């Protein structure tokens, strides 16, 4: 008779969870940030709000974003005037778009990740799908399983309405699944489309306007598993994870799904709350490793906006190049919510290899990935790079 202990040992992987492939995708419609204020106020019939338009222009100028990608183009918006209004009942129209488009964009990213991984998709044992764009039953996880032709027995996890910290959450969950299920290969997909949050301007809800200046669409996929086979190419090891709610941060970032779509509410002090608490998170993560010089590790941080990055950089005394990959993704794509940190992970490994830096983490061995979002919730993932 086999004991429970023997069964448990046989079920568990030997080594740490490893990111084995990354794929990204965006809608084809690219929006230039410098001309976006004119377009946005025209398409929402708000050109009479001249002072607010000037304010929005300043927001866009300060955003450090050059361009974004959006599923919503002029043609779609003209067909759906309720989406362009500030607070018109429009949830049905928004839902109809995103329940179709979120899985499709996710499929694009997942297909790229599976191609890089190089293994048959029948070897995928688990699927984690994450989106803040639309809710349906069966969910986007089911739709993606069908679109990709995954096995019907794939074990699915659907994460809705997590927001901007969830790029860290999916890695934490994937790590636990990979390490506790020997031979597991976890496909992780984050797919975000701003059709749920797009709306016209108003001078009574400026935090909504901040969202209109920052958010973009994108999907990212990674494949995670422990004990890589010789044919698999590890990129990063997932060594340690944590999630915490910051003290005195209730209401700092809120989102509410209503008849008018998803409304966002931001307190001005979000950058202050994050920068004030970031060192504690780093100490908890890196003290056991004997690391206290935060310029000696590579960094991936959710780029909620330039003020967050600036204040974290100042608080920790970081060299400007530490945030290079993060700032690059913000500049080229905007804030894509949960997908952002996976785009940055992809950018970092590509630039590290291009520049001959020796490891996937800018030539360094250890790194950290941060997700920030509603709560205010912080996700921390300690990464170990791979020699290239």
UniProtKB/Swiss-Prot annotation:
InterPro entries according to UniProt: Chalcone/stilbene_synt_C, Chalcone/stilbene_synt_N, Chalcone/stilbene_synthase_AS, Polyketide_synthase_type-III, Thiolase-like
Natural source organism: Glycine max (Soybean)
Positions of the catalytic residues: 164
GO biological process: flavonoid biosynthetic process; polyketide biosynthetic process
Reported function: The primary product of this enzyme is 4,2',4',6'-tetrahydroxychalcone (also termed naringenin-chalcone or chalcone) which can under specific conditions spontaneously isomerize into naringenin.
Highest taxon above the source species: Eukaryota
Record-given protein name: Chalcone synthase 2
Pathway noted in the entry: Secondary metabolite biosynthesis; flavonoid biosynthesis
Keyword Heme: no
Family: Belongs to the thiolase-like superfamily. Chalcone/stilbene synthases family.
Coiled-coil blocks: none
Entry's EC annotation: 2.3.1.74
Catalytic activity: (E)-4-coumaroyl-CoA + 3 malonyl-CoA + 3 H(+) = 2',4,4',6'-tetrahydroxychalcone + 3 CO2 + 4 CoA
Keywords carried by this UniProt record: Acyltransferase, Flavonoid biosynthesis, Transferase
């Amino acid at each position: 008779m086999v004991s429970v202990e023997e069964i448990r040992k046989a079920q568990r992987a030997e080594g740490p969870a490893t990111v084995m492939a990354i794929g990204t995708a965006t809608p084809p419609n690219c929006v230039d940030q410098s001309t976006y204020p004119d377009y946005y106020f025209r398409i929402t019939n708000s050109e009479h709000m001249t002072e607010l338009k000037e304010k929005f222009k300043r927001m866009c100028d300060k955003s450090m974003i050059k361009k974004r990608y959006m599923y919503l183009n002029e043609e779609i918006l003209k067909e759906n005037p309720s989406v362009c209004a500030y607070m018109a009942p429009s949830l049905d129209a928004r839902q109809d778009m995103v329940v179709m488009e979120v899985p499709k964009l996710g499929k694009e990213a997942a297909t790229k990740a599976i191609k890089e991984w190089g293994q048959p998709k029948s070897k995928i044992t688990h699927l984690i799908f994450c989106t803040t764009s639309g809710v349906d039953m069966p969910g986007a996880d089911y739709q993606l399983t069908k679109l990709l032709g995954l096995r019907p027995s794939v074990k699915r996890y659907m994460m809705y309405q997590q927001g901007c910290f969830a790029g860290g959450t999916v890695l934490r969950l994937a790590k636990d699944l990979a390490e506790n299920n020997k031979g597991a290969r976890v496909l992780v997909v984050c797919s975000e489309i701003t059709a749920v949050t797009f709306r016209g301007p108003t001078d009574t809800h400026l935090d909504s306007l901040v969202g209109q200046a920052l958010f973009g669409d994108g999907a990212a996929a990674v494949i995670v598993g422990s004990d890589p086979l010789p044919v698999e190419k590890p990129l990063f090891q997932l060594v340690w994870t944590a999630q915490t709610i910051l003290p005195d941060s209730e209401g700092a970032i809120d989102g509410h799904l209503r008849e008018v779509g998803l409304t966002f509410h931001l307190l001005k002090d979000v950058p202050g709350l994050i920068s004030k608490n970031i060192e504690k998170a780093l100490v908890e993560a890196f003290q056991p490793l004997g690391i206290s010089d935060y310029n000696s590790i590579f960094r991936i941080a959710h780029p909620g906006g330039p003020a967050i990055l600036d204040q974290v950089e100042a608080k920790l005394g970081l060299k400007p190049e530490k945030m290079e990959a993060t700032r690059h993704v913000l500049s080229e794509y905007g804030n894509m919510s949960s997908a952002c940190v996976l785009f940055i992970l992809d950018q970092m490994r590509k630039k590290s290899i291009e520049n001959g830096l020796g490891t996937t983490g800018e030539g360094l061995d250890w790194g950290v990935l941060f997700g920030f979002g509603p709560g205010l919730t912080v996700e921390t993932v300690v990464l170990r790079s791979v020699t290239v």
